[in-house]
Amino acid sequence: MTRIFLFSALLPHPVALLFGACGGNTAPSDGGTMDGAAATLDQHVPDRARLDHPLHPDAACGVTIDTPPLLDSPHVAIGTPVTYDSNPPSSGPHYPVWAAFQEFMTPVDRRYYVHDLEHGAVVLLYRCDDGAGCPDIVQGLRDVAASLPDDPICNKSTGPRNRVVITPDPLLPTAVAAAAWGWTYTADCLDAPSLKAFVSQHYGEGTEVVCANGQTQF
């Protein structure tokens, strides 16, 4: 049975976040660039074959890799409720603006980071249940992100060196997760080998090849 997750905004005033003058931050919608970062739009990447069933690689804890059906993925207005078919989402309707390729300390609304996936990013996610944070998990995710080489389409002198987002997500079913366009990874712990393999294999899966930075404050 397919699970459906109805996502309401994690943040109370998303419009203010998008258009507010916090530190003068403005984020481009598709077709724009920020800080001179290189971007190339509409270079469609061939979709890889979907899995017949979820994979459970050997790991230090339970790991599941899956390929949910790709959803129609139009832009929707800020605040529009969106239903995704997987947790974490890996495609679907999303906001016109995406999150910057960086680490965030507070949750990024899913409707932003799905747009990052469309741009070929991998989003690294975690859920802390004790309220004290997950320093070991967060450092492990940083190490995974650091293991990726520089992306040749990114201008690291004025923007990100690659297309990776790290963010907490309290809606996750597991302590650790990752998403690429059309691919999901969930794990009960931080298993660095399997997560690094997932990120390496599915980086750049999006239908648009974009490395312009996005919104930096949430």
Regions found by a protein language model. Give the residues of each.
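Sec-dependent bacterial lipoprotein signal peptides
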Residues: 1-20
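Residue-level signal for mature regions of secreted extracellular proteins and peptides
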Residues: 15-16, 53-55, 203-204
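Ser/Thr-rich, Pro/Gly/Ala-heavy low-complexity intrinsically disordered linkers and tails
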Residues: 18-52
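Sequence contexts marking disulfide-bonded cysteines in secreted/extracellular proteins
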Residues: 21-23, 60-63, 129, 133-135, ...
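Surface-exposed, low-hydrophobicity interaction/linker segments
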Residues: 45-114, 134
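Extracellular/mature segments of secreted proteins
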Residues: 68-71, 134, 141-142, 196-197, ...
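Mid-length scaffold segments of soluble, non-membrane domains
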Residues: 106-155
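Helix-rich interaction surfaces within compact, conserved domain-sized segments
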Residues: 147-218
